[in-house]
Amino acid sequence: PAWLKAHFQRVERMIQRDKNHPSILIWSLGNEAGNGYNFYEAYLLAKKLDVTRPTQYERAEHEWNTDLFVPMYDTPAQVEAYAKDPKRTKPYVQCEYAHAMGNSMGGFKEYWDLFEKYDKLQGGFIWDFVDQGLKTVKNGREIYAYGGDFGPKGTPSDNNFLMNGLVQADRTPNPHIHEVAHIQQDVKFYGNDLKKRII
């Protein structure tokens, strides 16, 4: 239970700060930090402080201290298996999926076909929305630096692993954002019988 006080402070401060924001739908206990006693207690505290919203924690997986099942990077086959499993009743939201690095997003439509087919599946959060570059000047030119741009050659870095957004650091759209917009559009058109005026 070391750090329990810190867990409590973070949960209480988060809920007190954000409880009146209408866009806050779900409380999160954190990300990628294991599960155990502190997270069990933090979940109970969150439920005590706000009974109106669900609380989720990715590393709780199928344990009791999460109201949603929120995995990372499940394949479409894993997503459908969850949807078809009658023992799995919690709403499903991928807290990270469809890693948007480079010219990626392959398989995005397959995920959304499943999300729209099964009520238990609620969608997910694309990693990332925006490239994580920092504006700086190099050789007299303004650039968005990342990875190996800091320090001499050989300085430890994540290389281009931080450049994985739907939009660039300056918010210029990357090509795959258009696929996302199309697949997630509110209106779907089916059929092509124009003589009967059916679309």
For the regions a protein language model found, what residue spans apply to each?
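Extended substrate-binding grooves/exosites of carbohydrate-active enzymes
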Residues: 1-199
